[in-house]
């Protein structure tokens, strides 16, 4: 087998990716490990992360600002798709993986690397997402997955890293695995592996507890154009600002926590904790606006598309042909999704209290009203019902005779 000399490693500064650096050099004999750190709005000092990679043995460490691309190319399409895996999880972590993989491949091309690598474990979802995305964009590139091969527990990985002077970022007593980006936080491992164990309050940072949230509600309005959120409370914002503002508003009122049993790609169930206040809020508002601007049959069919879209993204097929086709359908439905939605935030809840679309509303008050202004032709109902239920009536008549 050809000796690999230069590898690009997706790097986060966590246990697994930090340990990957000396492991690749000592176990694989790779001379140059170039790390790539993705700035996804995680609010971390990435210069410190970059320096940690160098201190851990990386020959070079690159930081890429992907925040705008992450929101515009990944988060906003997910909002249009009302993407909720298992009707709960808005894919905050899953959406980041194909973007990171895309940049890994691009950097590998630029520096003539022999391979790309990541620190995903052998029973997580991210290994699938990274590998599938890399294979789609750089099918000629070799993928190295040390954490999938070394068969070390998290505690053993920490000890391995300490031999090379790599400090552990987590407590050995309760080693939570936490992933953070602008869209939210995912927390797993430690005491959370007991599905009956309540998640401790100290693992949350984006959302207030119900007890500590404001005692008075706050009403907000979210404005959409072509299915994209463009403003909050009549203030038009950039896509990144939209997510930031939604995070702050929803999180302050304790909305956006998810505690779920998740069906992983590899076939096991896992307990996951998520904080995604802004993304959940925007999806809720978007779905509500669709209820007044889309035809019933479009809403019904789009619901099936949304479920499949979420599954594909969760399972790693962001760059697959079916996902691309579903994108085209979803996009075609969004030209009329224009308007605003009013939501009341209070004690962990986001309650829709109003919705309107000035030019695209299919709701007509003169048809829906029960007042004297009603223009609905009630006399047509009898004939409609007769035709609508005719097949059922014929079936009932036939079967009642058969029973006799």
Swiss-Prot record:
CDD domains from the entry? ASS
Where along the chain is ATP bound? 10-18, 38, 119
Which pathway, per its entry?
A: Amino-acid biosynthesis; L-arginine biosynthesis; L-arginine from L-ornithine and carbamoyl phosphate: step 2/3
Q: Where does L-citrulline bind?
A: 89, 125, 129, 177, 186, 262, 274
GO BP term (any one) = L-arginine biosynthetic process
- What does the entry list as the binding residues for L-aspartate? 121, 125-126
> Do you know which PROSITE patterns this protein is assigned to?
ARGININOSUCCIN_SYN_1, ARGININOSUCCIN_SYN_2
**A GO-annotated cellular component:** cytoplasm
User: Keywords on this record?
Assistant: Amino-acid biosynthesis, Arginine biosynthesis, ATP-binding, Cytoplasm, Ligase, Nucleotide-binding
Reaction catalysed by this chain? L-citrulline + L-aspartate + ATP = 2-(N(omega)-L-arginino)succinate + AMP + diphosphate + H(+)
* EC number(s) per entry: 6.3.4.5
**Compartments in which it is found:** Cytoplasm
Among the GO molecular function terms of this UniProt record, one is: argininosuccinate synthase activity
- PANTHER family assigned: ARGININOSUCCINATE SYNTHASE
Subunit and partners = Homotetramer.
Q: Which family does it belong to?
A: Belongs to the argininosuccinate synthase family. Type 1 subfamily.
Query: What's this protein's name?
Result: Argininosuccinate synthase
């Amino acid at each position: 087998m050809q000796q690999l000399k230069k590898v690009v490693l997706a790097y986060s500064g966590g246990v697994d990716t930090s340990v990957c650096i000396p492991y690749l050099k000592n176990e694989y004999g790779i001379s140059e490990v170039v790390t790539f750190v993705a700035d996804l709005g995680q609010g971390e000092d990435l210069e410190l992360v970059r320096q940690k990679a160098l201190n851990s043995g990386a020959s070079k460490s690159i930081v890429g600002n992907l925040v705008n691309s992450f929101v515009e190319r990944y988060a906003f399409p997910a909002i249009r798709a009302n993407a909720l895996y298992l009707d709960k999880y808005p894919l905050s972590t899953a959406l980041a993986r194909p973007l990171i993989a895309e940049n890994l491949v691009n950097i590998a091309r630029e520096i003539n690397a022999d391979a790309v690598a990541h620190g995903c474990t052998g029973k997580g979802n991210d290994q699938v997402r990274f590998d599938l995305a890399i294979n789609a964009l750089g099918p000629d590139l070799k993928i190295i997955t040390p954490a999938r091969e070394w068969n070390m527990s998290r505690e053993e990985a920490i000890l391995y890293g300490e031999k090379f002077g790599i400090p552990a970022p987590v407590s050995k007593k309760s080693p939570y695995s936490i992933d953070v980006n602008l869209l939210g936080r995912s927390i797993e491992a430690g005491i959370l592996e007991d599905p009956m164990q309540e998640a401790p309050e100290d693992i949350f940072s984006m959302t207030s507890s119900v007890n500590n949230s404001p005692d008075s509600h706050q009403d907000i309005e979210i404005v959409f154009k072509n299915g994209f959120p463009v403003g909050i409370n009549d203030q038009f914002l950039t896509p990144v600002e939209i997510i930031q503002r939604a995070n702050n508003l929803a999180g302050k009122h304790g909305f956006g926590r998810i505690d779920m049993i998740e069906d992983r790609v590899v076939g096991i169930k896992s307990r996951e904790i998520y904080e995604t206040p802004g993304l959940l809020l925007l999806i809720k508002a978007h779905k509500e606006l669709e209820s007044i601007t889309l035809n019933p049959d479009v809403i019904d069919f789009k619901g099936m598309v949304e479920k499949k879209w979420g599954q594909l993204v969760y399972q790693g097929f962001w760059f697959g042909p079916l996902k691309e086709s579903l994108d085209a359908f979803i996009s075609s439905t969004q030209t009329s999704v224009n308007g605003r939605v009013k939501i009341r935030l209070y004690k962990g809840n986001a309650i829709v209290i109003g919705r309107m679309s000035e030019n695209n509303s299919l709701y007509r008050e003169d048809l829906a009203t029960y007042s004297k202004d009603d223009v609905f032709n009630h006399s047509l109902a009898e004939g409609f019902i007769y035709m609508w239920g005719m097949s059922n009536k014929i079936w009932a008549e036939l079967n009642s005779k058969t029973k006799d």
